[in-house]
Amino acid sequence: MKIGDKLLKQLNKTYTPSVTIPLKFGRYDLIIKTDEYGNPILLFIGKANEEGIIKGERFSRVLIKDPDGKVIKDHWDNKGKV
């Protein structure tokens, strides 16, 4: 599975720092974990069961910035099934 442009637009937003956020995106359930700055760094996408646990795929974000805050690297890696 690939992350599409519409989902990337949703993931490039800034959220509340250091939280787990459940979302719906089309027919998929998402759980986003954010870092201390509110950037999404972990994504679980698939179908949630009645306990809210996602069965699908896990993505991890590589976000590297220089000391001035300019983004050097920013991409999502598929880490496999969950």
Task: Give residue ranges: language-model regions.
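Short, compact, well-ordered microdomains
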Residues: 55-82
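Extended, compositionally biased eukaryotic interaction scaffolds
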Residues: 1-51
